[in-house]
Amino acid sequence: MPSARVMPADLSRCRVRVGTLDGFAVAVTESGELILRLPTRSAEFRRRLKSWGCVVVAGRLPKVRAIRAHGSRFQLKVWQACQRIRPGQTATYGAIAKTVGCRSAQAVGTALGANPLAVLIPCHRVVSATGPGGFAWGLVRKRRWLQAERDGLAG
């Protein structure tokens, strides 16, 4: 799968097809651009897409040719910083905040909670200075993904 390119874009009226790929719910544009990949149920997934103004169309998923994340300028900076964390390594919310020129580790956590491309933008590698921190998809999953990377099973 192509690596994620973190870039801004307007999703209103974006036509997407929804399906499952590698155990994740995915949304792919008709031109083959993966715009959302989450470990979530399809009903929640479709609601999120529609709230962004996407039009969900029927049909088979096209081949994924590109990956693009959509978010605010700040979110994009945070997600880009996450992509620089190597598999099996972690960084603290505070370290990411410093990297992106922000004083608030909490703001970084909020940006990570909006990550639309789970694993491809590896927000699970960002931890609290005092422990694992939060994770939109649950701490059990975060710990498993980190351990799999440390064990060389993912990456």
Locations of regions flagged by a protein language model:
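Basic nucleic-acid-binding alpha-helical/helix-turn surface characteristic of O6-alkylguanine DNA
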Residues: 1-103, 152-155
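Helix-turn-helix DNA-binding helix
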Residues: 107-108
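Residue-level signal for inorganic ion chemistry
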Residues: 82, 96, 123-124, 145
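…primarily DNA-binding HTH/wHTH and HhH modules…
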Residues: 130-155
